[in-house]
Regions:
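Extended alpha-helical interface modules used as scaffolds for assembling large macromolecular complexes
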Residues: 1-104
Length: 104
């Protein structure tokens, strides 16, 4: 199995687990950095920083430059904090493509 297959399978499984726990809001799942790190470090076929680079490049997460997080207005804390934002629309497209057989 190649790295792209591993990354995609891992991404799909992570989002499926997250959507059972977190609310999908505006095609986004907002999670804490520690939660994201725990999921990405579970399978050590690549380092955390290498995986976040790939996630950013493939638009799996919504981020600002030079980081894997985005400022997010936390309504409970009433302040802006940095969170990981999973791009749910990318997940839907990737999952559909990954599970569809090409009739070539």
């Amino acid at each position: 199995m190649n790295y792209l297959d591993l990354i995609i399978k891992e991404y799909i499984s992570i989002v499926e687990m997250l959507q059972g726990v977190y609310e999908v809001e505006s095609n986004r799942i907002v999670i804490e950095r520690e939660v994201f790190r725990d999921y990405l470090e579970k399978y050590a076929y690549m380092t955390f920083s290498a995986k976040t680079k790939v996630y950013k490049a493939l638009n799996f997460i919504i981020h600002d430059s030079n980081n894997y997080t985005m400022p997010y207005k936390d309504t409970e804390l009433k302040k802006t904090v940095r969170k990981v934002i999973i791009n749910y629309s990318t997940y839907q497209e990737v999952k559909k493509l990954y599970e569809t057989n090409a009739n070539i």
